[in-house]
UniProtKB/Swiss-Prot annotation:
This is Ribosomal RNA small subunit methyltransferase G. Its EC number is 2.1.1.170. NCBIfam families: rsmG_gidB. It comes from Coxiella burnetii (strain Dugway 5J108-111). InterPro entries: rRNA_ssu_MeTfrase_G, SAM-dependent_MTases_sf. Pfam families: GidB. It catalyses: guanosine(527) in 16S rRNA + S-adenosyl-L-methionine = N(7)-methylguanosine(527) in 16S rRNA + S-adenosyl-L-homocysteine.
Length: 204
């Protein structure tokens, strides 16, 4: 299975040290164990987790900008945890309103010594960290417009939203920021369509 992860990372054109890949794989095993009791993800097999969670998350790595990243609605840690593993020089904040999910994330961060992550249990609309983020990521949480409206107070001027979607979100993009760019994500081993909506924050 670790070879499947390595091949996928190579196909994405990414450079991730083998020790980090091993930690990512161990994180999936940890998630699988917790999932038996807490139902954190509908995907239960490691093989599918590699594709649907790890590689899917890592597919947006080339688009990541800045040093302060906020992952909204992190759930079981995607895309935030894989990105934090891959970018130890950046600081990630993972926010989710559900206690069982943030409890898992706190345990995972401690167990795997992911020192560049901060876990927050709170609704993102109420979150006031006292500073702006450079990039806000989000996967499977609301429409593009909803995500932008809920997090607008957290993104610095000139920063970016990276919103992960399945099929091309044509309807969602109507009436949103004209600077939106949609990238096709080719996730190794994943047959389903994946897209990334990149929107620059033009507020002055």
């Amino acid at each position: 299975m670790t070879e499947k992860l390595k091949q996928g990372i190579d196909q994405l054109g990414l450079k991730v040290p083998e020790t980090i890949q091993q930690s990512m794989f161990a994180f999936l095993a940890f998630l699988q164990k917790w999932n038996q009791a807490y139902n954190l993800t509908a995907i239960t097999e490691i093989k599918s987790m590699i594709t649907h969670h790890l590689l899917d998350s890592l597919s947006i790595l080339p688009y990541l900008k800045g040093d302060k990243i906020l992952d909204v609605g992190s759930g079981a840690g995607f895309p935030g945890i894989p990105l934090a593993f891959a970018c130890p020089e950046k600081k990630f904040t993972l926010i989710d309103s559900k206690a069982k999910k943030t409890a898992f994330l706190l345990q995972a961060a401690s167990r795997f010594k992911i020192t560049n992550v901060t876990i927050i249990q709170e609704r993102v609309g109420s979150y006031q960290p006292g500073f702006y983020f450079d990039t806000i990521t989000c996967r499977a949480l609301g429409s593009v417009r909803e995500i932008m409206e809920q997090t607008n107070h957290l993104l610095r001027p000139g920063g970016q939203w990276l919103i992960m979607k399945g099929t091309y979100p044509e309807k969602e993009l109507r009436g949103t920021d004209a600077s939106a760019i949609v990238h096709v994500l080719n996730v190794p081993g994943l047959k389903a369509e994946r897209h990334l909506v990149e929107v620059k924050n033009n507020k002055g």
